[in-house]
Every structure is written in C-alpha cells, then in structure tokens.
C-alpha cells in the first residue's frame, strides 16, 4: 500500500508540474514580446544631436539640473571653439580625415567623436540651406520664364490676328485684280478685232493699187535712137509707186540691160542704117 500511495503521489506531482509548465508556455505565447530598449541618443533627431554634443564639449561648467552625475559631465562649446569649428568647416567642406579630426579635437580640447558629429550636423544644415537657396534661385528663374512665356503667347495671338487680317486684304485684292484683268482682256480682244479689220482694209487697198499699176502702160525706159536710158533713180521711183514689181512686155529690154549704156557702144547705128 505504501508503494502504491507513493507512486500515486508522484504521478499527481508530475501532472501538476506538467500543467504548470503548459500554462507557462501558453501564457508566454499570449503575452506580447517586450519592447526593445532603444538608447535615448538614437531617438533624438539628427538636427538635435548637435545641441546634445554641444553640451559634451569642454568649456564652461553649466550642468543640467535634475540629472545627477550624468549632468555634471555635460558642458557647452565655448565661442572660441565654435569659431574655430566654423572656420575649419568653411575651409574644408568635405569630410575630414580621422587624423585631421584628432588634431582639431586636440587643439580645441574636445573628443574626436564630438568634432565628427559637429561637422556632420553642420554639413546637414549647410546642405539644407544650400538647397533652399538653389530652390529660391530656380523659382525666380521659373517665374521669369513663365512671365516670358505668357507674354510670348499674347504676342503670338496678336500676330495671328494680324496675319488673318492681311490674308483677308490679300484675298480681296486678288479678287479685284481678277475682275480688272477680265475687263482688260475683253478690251484687248475688241481692239484686236478692230485692228484686224483695218489690216484687211489695208490689204485690199494694196491689191487695188497693184491692179491699177497693171492697167497702166509700161513706160518707155529706153530710147534707142537717142541712146538714152532711164536712170536707176527713175526706176526706184517707179518701183516705189507700185508695191509689186511688174514684168516688162516682150517688146522692151530688161531694166538691167537698159541701165548699162556701155553695152550699146560697140553696136554702130550707121551700119544698121546702111543695111536698111
């Protein structure tokens, strides 16, 4: 009996321990995980870190009240240290080398980490100011260009109106010139018809004159007995009177033969009379 009782008690204790362990696991599963512990330095914004490390420099002994021993170590940058850091920053905009940081910290009586953080915050502020300055310059340029674009739009609109007016005037002028050209063409055609009739009348007059010349008897251009012939001047006058040159009759000599009296010299007229 004692053995059985001891075994039963051990079983009961084991069951109690198992339930307790199971309850602990369930309780741990239901509980949220603990929040991670974040250092107070990481919770501060980047721009406030400069002010924090300004209290870590060596200078006046202004301790923060209500912070115990931690506040006793906080000091503020002196004006001389700030001027030295400002001059070094304006001289070297780039990131300082570790050797330069250590040398500057030793000269100012600061820690290299304080100098590095001060330069980091100073560069951040300088970049933000530079961005603001660049934005202001770009904004002014944009406003100037926008006003210029608006003025150009107004000029374009005015030029478009002027172009439309000039096109209307040109179209009206072309219409007027087209009407005047038609009238001029009609007048020229009528004048051409009148001149054609006049030319026909002139041709008729010339033909009548030629017929009159043909009706006239041909003048005696040569006199054989007196050995005289018509001069070229007389021939030209007769040719001027008639537009068309007339042929001589068969009983007369040609003009070229009469115009050269030298051809008659070797022909003695006496022999002709003797023969007759």
From Swiss-Prot:
A Pfam family per the record: Homeodomain
Q: Does the keyword Cytoplasm apply?
A: no
Indicate the principal place this protein occupies in or around the cell. nucleus
Q: Does the keyword Iron-sulfur apply?
A: no
Query: According to the UniProt record, where is the region Disordered?
Result: 170-212
What are its GO biological-process terms?
Answer: positive regulation of DNA-templated transcription
Looking at the UniProt feature table, which residue ranges are given for the DNA-binding region? 70-130
According to UniProt, the tissues expressing it are described as:
Expressed in seedlings, roots, stems, leaf sheaths and blades and panicles.
Indicate where this protein resides in the cell: Nucleus
Q: What factors induce this protein? A: In leaves by drought stress.
Which Gene Ontology terms cover its molecular function? DNA-binding transcription factor activity, RNA polymerase II-specific; sequence-specific DNA binding
Q: Where is this region: Leucine-zipper?
A: 129-173
- List the GO cellular component terms: nucleus
Q: Report biased composition (Low complexity) as residue ranges.
A: 182-197
Family in the record: Belongs to the HD-ZIP homeobox family. Class I subfamily.
What is this protein identified as?
Homeobox-leucine zipper protein HOX22
Q: Supply the source organism for this entry.
A: Oryza sativa subsp. indica (Rice)
Organism lineage: Eukaryota, Viridiplantae, Streptophyta, Embryophyta, Tracheophyta
Q: Which gene encodes it?
A: HOX22
């Amino acid at each position: 009996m004692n053995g059985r009782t001891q075994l039963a008690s051990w079983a009961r204790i084991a069951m109690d321990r198992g339930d307790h362990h199971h309850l602990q696991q369930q309780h741990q599963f239901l509980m949220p995980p603990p929040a991670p512990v974040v250092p107070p330095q990481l919770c501060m914004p980047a721009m406030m870190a400069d002010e924090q490390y300004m209290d870590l420099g060596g200078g006046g002994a202004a301790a923060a009240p209500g912070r115990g021993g931690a506040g006793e170590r906080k000091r503020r940058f002196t004006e001389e240290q700030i001027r030295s850091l400002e001059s070094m920053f304006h001289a070297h905009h780039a990131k300082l080398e570790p050797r330069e940081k250590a040398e500057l910290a030793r000269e100012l009586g600061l820690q290299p980490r304080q100098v590095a953080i001060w330069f980091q915050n100073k560069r951040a502020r300088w970049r933000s100011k530079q961005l603001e300055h660049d934005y202001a310059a770009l904004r002014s340029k944009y406003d100037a260009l926008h006003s210029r674009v608006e003025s150009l739009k107004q000029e374009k609109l005015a030029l478009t109106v002027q172009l439309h007016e000039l096109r209307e005037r040109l179209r009206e002028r072309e219409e007027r010139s087209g009407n005047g050209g038609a009238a001029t063409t009609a007048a020229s055609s009528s004048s051409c018809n009148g001149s054609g009739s006049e030319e026909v009348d002139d041709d008729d007059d010339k033909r009548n004159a030629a017929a009159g010349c043909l009706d006239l008897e041909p003048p005696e251009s040569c006199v054989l007995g007196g050995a005289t012939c018509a001069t070229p001047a007389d021939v030209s006058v007769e040719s001027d009177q008639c537009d068309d040159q007339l042929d001589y009759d068969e009983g007369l000599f040609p003009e070229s033969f009469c115009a050269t009296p030298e051809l008659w010299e070797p022909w003695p007229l006496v022999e002709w009379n003797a023969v007759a």
